[in-house]
Amino acid sequence: MPYWASTLKNIDFGANLFVFDENFGQRQGFLFVLLYAELYYLNIIQNIMEIKLNLKQAGVLAIAAMAALSVQARGGKRLSEYVNPFIGATTNTQMAKAEHGLGKTFPGVATPWGMTQVSPNTITGGDNGSGYSYEHTTIEGFALTQMSGIGWYGDLGNYLVMPTTGPLHTYRGEAERPEEGYRSRYDKESETARAGYYAVRLTDYDIRAELTATPHGGVMRFTYPENECSRIQIDLARRVGGTSVRQYVERVDDYAIRGWMRCTPDGGGWGNGGGKADYTVYFYTRFSKPLERYGVWSAEFPEGMGRKLENVTSPEFAEAVRRAKVTERPDRMEGDHLGFYTEFPTCEGEQVLMRTAISFVSLEGAEANFKAELKGKDFERYCEKAAALWDEALSKIKISGGTEDERTIFYTSLYHTMIDPRDYRDVTGEYVGGDRKVHKTDAFKKRTVFSGWDVFRSQFPLQNLINPEVVNDMINSFVTLAEENGTGVYERWEFLNAYSGCMLGNPAIAVIVDAYMKGIRGYDVEKAYRFARQTADRIGHHPELGYSPGGSGISETLEYGYFDWCVGEWAEALDKTEDAGIYHRRGQAYRKIFDKEKGWFRVRNADGSWADWPEKGRLQEWYGCMECNPYQQGWFVPHDVSGMVEIMGGRDKVLADLESFFENTPREFYWNPYYNHANEPVHHVPFLFNRLGAPWLTQYWTRVICADAYKNSLAGLCGNEDVGQMSAWYILASAGFHPLCPGETRYELTAPVFDRVEIALDRRYAKGRKFVVTTEGNAPDACYIQSATLNGKPYNRCYIDHEDIVRGGELHFVLGRTPNKQWGVE
């Protein structure tokens, strides 16, 4: 392709498209240019993402005029080109200096909110929820589903594909001896990842693997050496935290197979079975090579052998799979541990394509998804389409200013926030409900993977602004699931319809109430409210004590109190006065566990006595708390900061304590007993300074956290990504505002990292088209707000209301190197 044509292909057009002859106005006769474009609209700005040129006569040149670059950022790069999928892609505990590891993201390919995540997997066992860690030296295969940034042993990693040559291995093998299995060492220098594309060279087989994705499927291209016995093999039993317990595969025609993989708690998975994940993945696959030499391997296990993680990683399990029986050319097979392979000769550099669609509903659903998204065979076109989807999604926020690394961190963070909650429907609108029956709807997209304890804090407040329809979908998914499964309550950590019970609290309530208060109401409000009230009543404080005794009593009392307050706020908005009074009173539960003698929150027993105070005092991790200590958890009274300050001894004392909390924090922000940005309980704390009349400290510390806790590197996330939460915090804080208390419409203001942040508003939920945050005098050491204007008028508040944002307009900050202790003080 000539240079000008390749340039045209990637230009983003914001105005009319003009096509004319280079001698326009002089030539005689007809000159033809056929220009075909796929158009999509971003806030009424036309974007051309793919241009096919067919020049019918020599001497004809197509030139396009453009008015705006709507999917390009500073420097002419597409927004998707700023994404670095390796940020956070490690589970390494030594790097993290804690057992919880670092980001735990995956480096493979996904589309925004897509059902599939096509990614390399380096490990099956351990606390490696994404199935991948960068420092691992071998790859087991490439799966079609993954979880992003989670702990607790993970799940998915289904349909593990591996291109191989030579003898057939039915077991994955061990990392220390990869030659004894189908896994392979790989060339780290060859490993490449970007939005829409992943590639690596498997050195044991001299095969180059390339991956891309569609919303319901994945495309893999393998480049082989010359070999009489090249192969694609698929471990149908594989699962990140265990195994599927039953599988089925059948040959459809000379190029296609289909089947399913049944995953239950008996096979480990989410929480090693404790998360109660129970699902079936259906697949439909077409190969570019005919199925001539193919077969299925089937392993049998000793009677009584379990199928959970400890069994799957045992020598006995490995030996049973190594001895698997191989059946050649079966029409179909079903069993407890199956794998499929197809073999073929290849010449040097020969490429073999494999296209797969999945469904959680049925075989027919998988085939329908395939026909809708995977008809073509052009691998590059699939890559470009995936990148184009990310260009569109990432253009919800456009930034200028900052360094190249900061822009990469920003757009990678935004990318990570748009993986979940993923679409759980087929293209037909069908999905499996909480009653295990198939339902169909076009009213909303059924969504799944809700890491509630994490994402109510920043992730969903962010999506309320930039993707309110996704939030509306999620709320409909909450409501229908609670109705379908007959519980009438919301789950705190939902995974593929499973109520896993992971963590604590009632975060779905906060998500729904925050959305309702911000005008997102496309669901049955009365039913949603009824389920919220039932959730708070059934899953919360001890009904007679009014607090949670023992165990994780500090975390439970504080968090359940906040969620009760959320119900009270919603009741008040719905004119349910009696309910409002009840739940607002329950929101004061924090007062019942504050020990005046210790000056802090303390575990209280059921008889009203205090539990023993630990030797480390409020720095004792797990004392009454979930994944934190009382010093960290104790700041969580976001709905009544003034009441919290009162019982803690007043503003001056609290402010001094809060400053000490941050000053004792290690600057790399890895797991620590003070401001532990590596975990969620403290994510609101930097914004407390605004409420304490010291907004310049919010400005200072958010800038420090953005600079030191986030990096354009493998260790660029100081803690688990947690399904978008860690990244969403960065997006909001670096843009200059973040909520302290979801359920309120107030956002706390701080100093933006970037010179300009432009947020595209959804006109279905907003009056304005865009909200822009701009800065003057911005620099790495100029983090203090000197003054501000909102739509040209002086603005002296350290907060802004949601209504001011969705109305559209511009918030302008003048920044300086010294604090202005008069601006924004309440």
Enumerate the predicted regions with their spans:
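Bacterial Sec-dependent N-terminal signal peptides
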Residues: 1-4, 22-75
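Accessory carbohydrate-recognition regions in carbohydrate-active enzymes
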Residues: 74-558, 566, 571-592, 598-601, ...
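Ser/Thr/Pro/Gly-rich low-complexity, intrinsically disordered segments
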Residues: 8, 19-23, 82
